[in-house]
Amino acid sequence: MPELHQSIAQHYHERTKYNPETLASKSQRLDWTKQPVPFKEYKIGSTFDLKPYIQEKPEAFANNPDAQWWQRLSRLLFRSYGLTAKMPSMGSAVYLRAAPSAGGLYPAEVYVVSRGTSLLPPGLYNYQCRTHSLMHYWESDVWQTLQAAC
């Protein structure tokens, strides 16, 4: 059987995902009464739903270059920072993420900067892992300002 080539995002995910055996053996007691809010939410802006593009069958979008672009972005975000499991615990859910951490519930946030394309208007976006979507929360062409700052 020929070896399948993985994308960089899939390779990263496979090497950093939690293993149930090591997760249980290295866990420490948590104070369940002091849980932070596990998701950052932006209440303003427009949402780009990425769920339709997470399909594992790339041929579903074979004749649609725009959908292929959305599928690549959807997979990159999911495999680098998406929710990979939901475990019930003490009356509430514990979410596991693709991103490795030292036990933090949300050690990072993922943002996308768009200079503006036919598919993604210019501005700043936050990846909403709970809903697997992009929140366009800052509608401005910030690309040139960021380039000048670098």
Regions found by a protein language model. Give the residues of each.
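N-terminal accessory segments that position/regulate proteins before the catalytic core
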Residues: M1-C150
